[in-house]
């Protein structure tokens, strides 16, 4: 369980840095799309990070998978979210699809590298 807590915390910490660096852009983008200020549903966010932790641990880390495989899993996971938004929201920017999809791969790869530096 300690391993999963490390993964969970690492995902949140790295994502906080990413979201913080994009916050001004994201606030405007979400405001333009939903016509109200960005407000995070923390239960939804918690469940999202639990799901991301499960995916990364079950499919990659528990099997000592390659960092490239972690990158591809993150890329695919974030691509599903981004392309769904791109398909369903009129003003979802292609820039966000590209940047956030790449970030998913980077997030999973960095988290895996940190995990392996401690546990392998």
Question: What are these model-derived regions, one by one?
Answer:
Residues 1-120:
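Juxtamembrane/disordered regions of integral membrane proteins
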């Amino acid at each position: 369980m300690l391993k999963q807590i490390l993964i969970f915390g690492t995902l949140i910490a790295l994502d906080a840095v990413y979201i913080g660096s994009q916050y001004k852009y994201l606030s405007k983008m979400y405001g333009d799309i939903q016509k109200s200020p960005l407000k995070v549903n923390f239960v939804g966010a918690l469940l999202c990070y639990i799901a991301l932790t499960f995916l990364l641990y079950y499919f990659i880390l528990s099997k000592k998978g390659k960092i490239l495989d972690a990158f591809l899993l993150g890329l695919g996971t974030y691509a599903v979210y981004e392309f769904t938004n791109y398909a369903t929201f009129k003003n979802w920017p292609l820039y966000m699809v590209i940047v956030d999809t790449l970030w998913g791969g980077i997030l999973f790869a960095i988290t895996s590298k940190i995990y392996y530096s401690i546990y392998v």
